[in-house]
Amino acid sequence: MVTGVGSGLGKFIHNSLPNSIGIDRSNHAKIMREAKSQSYDLIIHCAFDPKHHVEDYYKYFKDNLQFTQELLEIPHKKFIYLSTIDVYREENSIYKFTKLMAESIVENNCINHLIVRCSALLGPTMRENTFLKLMNKTLTKTGLSKDSEFNYVLYEDIYEFFVQANNKNLVGIFNLVSKDNISLQQVSDYFGCTPQFGDFIYTTPFHISNAVRMYINGSEFLSNRLK
């Protein structure tokens, strides 16, 4: 079973994993009703409402925390939860705290769990973002500074890690990141896109211990992995 299959990593994994059952907003109620009476080898929980500015807190709670609890009540052999390296940020946010609370729910309700904290995700089913606009040369202006730094990992590499982790029955928390961050200027130069940059410098949490670092460096990622 895979959640969040409407777009992003969830959709990519659902399309890549043979015979998997996918959950999105359109079939959520039906699938969850049927799932309680079945048993699953693996549940991969990718769905999350990433809002940083929340207006309806009860809905935010239901979509992110209650849904995680309900998934854990479905009979299963292994549970993989997609988290984020934003939990390492010094500044506090509802996004950070909700991810940490969801992780705690998983840890306390499932012995055979895998929590994977990833950096920024790139793949064919991702929603439009600054990276995609640079790649498509459609970004003309952004509030981000050219010195903003991001850390990217590819859907296909995360999927492969999930498969291998399940086969080897890995348990615990893993940080899945690239070895180096990449500046927005580097990405812009690589794709030959020259937008008007702003002043806001975004930085990615990077000094993370016990990380599975996927690529040699930023240049290797752009030239060899991103094709």
Question: What is each PLM-predicted segment?
Answer:
Residues 100, 104-151, 155:
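NAD(P)-dependent short-chain dehydrogenase/reductase
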Residues 144-146, 153-227:
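C-terminal substrate-binding subdomain of Rossmann-fold SDR/epimerase-dehydratase oxidoreductases
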Residues 19-29:
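A short beta-strand-loop structural module common to alpha/beta enzyme folds
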Residues 66-67, 78, 101-102, 154-157:
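Conserved cofactor-binding/catalytic machinery of classical short-chain dehydrogenase/reductase
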Residues 1-19:
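N-terminal Rossmann NAD(P)H-binding glycine-rich loop of SDR-like oxidoreductase domains
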Residues 31-66, 70-74, 84-89:
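NAD(P)H-binding glycine-rich loop region in Rossmannoid oxidoreductase-like domains
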Residues 59-67, 84-116, 120-121:
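Catalytic helix-loop patch of NAD(P)-dependent Rossmann-fold dehydrogenases
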Residues 3, 43-46, 79-85, 116-118:
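SDR active-site strand-loop-helix element
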